A protein has these predicted regions:
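Outer-membrane beta-barrel strand-turn architecture
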Residues: 10, 68-70, 125-129, 172
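Predominantly the C-terminal beta-signal and adjacent terminal strand-loop region
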Residues: 128-171
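Outer-membrane beta-barrel domain signature
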Residues: 48-53, 108-112, 146-157
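Residues on the lipid-exposed face of transmembrane beta-strands in outer-membrane beta-barrel proteins
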Residues: 4, 62-66, 121-125, 166-170
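Residues that define the transmembrane beta-barrel architecture of outer-membrane proteins
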Residues: 56-60, 113-119, 158-164
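Extracellular/periplasmic loop regions
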Residues: 1-78, 83-108
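Outer membrane beta-barrel transmembrane domains
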Residues: 88-122, 126, 134-136, 140
């Protein structure tokens, strides 16, 4: 089943003293992608690479769900692109000495000069009626602007995040 998900979330302006213009958030996975926003089948952690909600960025995710060439075997493929909506003057105005590594995830604050992209491949195999095997692979690439964050921060931040997981689920 092909699908597309797109959104726009407001971001901060360049003034750190007039309150945040970002969308308020509740700390829960937003299952748009497997690694970036916490939609993975074996994902039990609350930490997400890109955060928990769409605040401060716009994005597009294309997916092909439930691809099947064999009975009881299904695949899902996703590709996502995310671009910040926070003003690129904010990091300097707020005296951010390092890239924010918030509880939402290390890539959770993107400015209008920053972007990230993600690829996911998920496979599920129903071994028995009550037993299912899942294999997930996900990769996120962060692209930070050196003019916004400075050379030191851009060079220090890990820009590649990936996960490969295998899980079994037994249903009673």
């Amino acid at each position: 089943t092909p699908g597309i998900i797109a959104w726009y979330g407001s971001g901060d302006d360049g003034n750190p003293y007039n309150g945040s213009e970002r969308l308020p958030q509740y700390n829960t996975p937003w299952a748009v992608s497997a690694l970036g926003f916490g939609g993975g089948w074996t994902d039990i952690a609350t930490w997400k690479v890109l955060g928990h909600n769409p605040g401060g960025l716009w994005g597009v995710v294309l997916h092909l769900k439930d691809i099947s060439f064999m009975e009881d075997l299904k695949h899902t493929l996703r590709a996502g692109y995310y671009h910040g909506t926070n003003n690129s003057a904010m990091p300097k105005a707020a005296n951010m000495a390092s890239y924010p590594s918030r509880i939402d995830g290390p890539f959770a604050y993107l400015t209008t000069s920053d972007d990230a992209w993600e690829l996911n491949a998920d496979t599920r195999y129903k071994i028995y009626e009550n037993l299912e095997l899942a294999v997930e692979a996900a990769y996120v690439r962060l692209n930070l602007d050196e003019g916004t964050w400075g050379k030191k921060i851009v060079n220090e931040v890990d820009k590649d995040s990936y996960r490969v997981s295998i899980g079994l689920k037994y249903s009673f």
